[in-house]
């Protein structure tokens, strides 16, 4: 079988931060294990990129995640509701270069399924 990890961007970057700053604690060790899973699994699904609070640390964590997985030739799916222009405002040129150069963009069109469900329930 294949090892797959799914995480929202915000939660993944929180795990990176916890692993670094709470090293030695039970929470820090659990976070470090999650980070290793994100870096080493066969397929990582990073959901909702761009919804996290953008900090120097979250940007560093994103770079580490993307670059490490590319170096290890591991598959990664990144979902976002951000346009390319929004991503350019949020992230560094190094991150954007990797995303634009190494990933295939698959735009989704149509209405938001959550809005459709809400309308049906009303």
Please annotate each region the language model reported.
Residues 2-40, 56:
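Short glycine-rich substrate-engagement loop in P-loop NTPases that contacts/grips substrate
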């Amino acid at each position: 079988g294949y090892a797959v990890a799914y995480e929202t961007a915000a939660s993944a970057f929180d795990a990176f931060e916890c692993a670094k700053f709470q090293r030695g604690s039970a929470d820090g060790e659990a976070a470090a294990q999650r980070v290793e899973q994100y870096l080493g699994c066969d397929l990582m699904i990073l959901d909702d990129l761009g919804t996290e609070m953008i900090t120097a640390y979250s940007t560093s964590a994103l770079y580490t995640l993307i670059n490490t997985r590319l170096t290890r030739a591991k598959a990664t799916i990144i979902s976002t509701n951000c346009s390319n222009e929004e991503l350019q405002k949020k992230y560094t040129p190094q991150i954007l270069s990797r995303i634009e150069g190494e990933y295939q963009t698959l735009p989704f069109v149509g209405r938001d399924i959550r809005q459709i469900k809400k309308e049906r329930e009303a």
